[in-house]
């Protein structure tokens, strides 16, 4: 089974992504990964950190001459700001008798962060892990960690492209109270135009509404969330399974999206709108075609019974406003128990456009795992042979002659 994990802290020396059981022969380059990481930094409303937080990439293992080897892949993203944090984030014990060390740990970046931010991992993490301050929690819970996931997912994206010819696309539906985009669903041919939009929007009117929301929030010292949509065309029938809850592909995709920092809701297809419809209006009726079976609608978002049904996969994720609010919220100082205002770390006004790129990454990883579970293969060539045989079977299974 394809597996992935990440390690590292926001201001630590580096982030590391590890991918296991990726077949041999998948093309991948440092430029491929750098491109996806640059897309993650996109977006109107990002903070100053994006301007100098370069991604210093090193491909450590599992890749040779531009191809995966079949062995574990390790990718490191160095922190170009590490020299400023060597004392504060040192893995070695500190000598607090040293005046320079004591000074660094008593003020500025090193000062204890005892006032947890509402909406963040600070409070529960400090209690759960018995930390006296929030630094050990916020360093790992920071969305900076998603850079490692995006790096790992680049390999998965290339695998999906090589095996199925599919691409994973996202766009922003709305930011804050902006008028939501209700136009036609984009295709991968629209990706350059979407990425060229400051808010990764499909439509100029929607873009202007989103930018207006961000400008207003910035002036008011506030932050914003929003909704992103992920679309994948061309998936075969039968990825995932109905046989158990954990095998259902929609459950896996929802879990992966909910695992992104600040995501508070996930919708498959028309999702919550389906709950307001009658059954006769909610489901995608099937029609016979010369090629087999098609649908008149795609309200299910390409998933039925936990399996892909051959229609376009469509998912939405709702991101809450960033919890580091410039006009600090009320909290409790964990060192004294007294009322206080929350700590303020450098952050964005809005990170919804970037969340779409991270959502693409998680969908790509889950889909790559589903493809390998269905088709197997120790090499890319073997997986492609298995897929070709299955596609031949499906074509025959749905062949009844002219409609």
From Swiss-Prot:
Short name of one Pfam family: Chorismate_synt
GTP-binding recorded as keyword: no
Entry's cofactor comment: Reduced FMN (FMNH(2)).
UniProt: NADP(+) binding residues: 40, 46
Region of interest (Disordered), residue spans: 277-307
Cofactor: FMNH2
Pathway entry: Metabolic intermediate biosynthesis; chorismate biosynthesis; chorismate from D-erythrose 4-phosphate and phosphoenolpyruvate: step 7/7
Entry EC no(s): 4.2.3.5
Binding site for FMN: 140-142, 261-262, 305, 320-324, 346
Top-level lineage group: Bacteria
Enzyme class: lyase
UniProt family annotation: Belongs to the chorismate synthase family.
Oligomeric form and interacting partners: Homotetramer.
Name by which UniProt lists this protein: Chorismate synthase
Record gene name: aroC
């Amino acid at each position: 089974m394809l597996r992935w994990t990440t390690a590292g802290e926001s201001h630590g020396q580096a982030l590391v992504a590890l991918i296991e059981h990726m077949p041999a022969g998948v093309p991948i380059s440092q430029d491929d990964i750098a491109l996806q990481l640059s897309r993650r930094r996109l977006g109107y409303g990002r903070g100053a950190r994006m301007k100098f937080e370069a991604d210093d990439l090193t491909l450590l293992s599992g890749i040779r001459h531009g191809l995966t080897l079949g062995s574990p892949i390790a990718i490191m993203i160095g922190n170009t700001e590490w020299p400023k944090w060597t004392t504060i984030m040192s893995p070695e014990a500190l000598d607090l008798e040293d005046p320079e060390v004591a000074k660094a740990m008593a003020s500025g970046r090193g000062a204890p962060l005892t006032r947890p931010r509402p909406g963040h991992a600070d409070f529960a993490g400090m209690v759960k892990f018995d930390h006296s301050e929030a630094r050990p929690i916020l360093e790992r819970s920071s969305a900076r960690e998603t850079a490692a996931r995006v790096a790992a997912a680049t390999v998965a994206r290339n695998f999906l492209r090589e095996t199925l010819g599919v691409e994973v696309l996202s766009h922003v539906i709305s930011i804050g109270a902006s008028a939501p985009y209700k136009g036609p669903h984009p295709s991968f041919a629209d990706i350059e135009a979407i990425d060229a939009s400051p808010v990764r929007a499909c439509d100029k009117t929607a873009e202007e509404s989103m930018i207006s929301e961000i400008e207003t929030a910035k002036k008011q010292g506030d932050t914003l969330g929003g909704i992103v949509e992920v679309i994948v065309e061309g998936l075969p029938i039968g990825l995932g399974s109905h046989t158990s809850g954990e095998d259902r592909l929609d459950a896996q995709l929802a879990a992966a999206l909910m695992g992104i920092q600040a995501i508070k809701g996930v919708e498959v297809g028309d999702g919550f709108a389906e709950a307001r419809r009658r059954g006769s209006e909610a489901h995608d009726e099937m029609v016979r075609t010369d090629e087999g079976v098609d649908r008149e609608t795609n309200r299910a978002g390409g998933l039925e019974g936990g399996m892909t049904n051959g229609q376009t996969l469509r998912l939405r994720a709702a991101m809450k406003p960033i919890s580091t609010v410039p006009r600090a919220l009320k909290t409790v100082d964990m060192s004294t128990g007294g009322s206080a205002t929350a700590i303020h770390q450098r952050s964005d006004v809005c990170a919804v456009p970037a969340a779409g790129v991270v959502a693409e990454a998680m969908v790509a990883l889950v889909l790559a795992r589903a493809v390998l579970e269905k088709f197997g293969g120790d090499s890319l060539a073997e997986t492609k042979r298995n897929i070709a045989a299955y596609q031949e079977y499906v074509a025959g299974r749905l062949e009844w002659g002219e409609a």
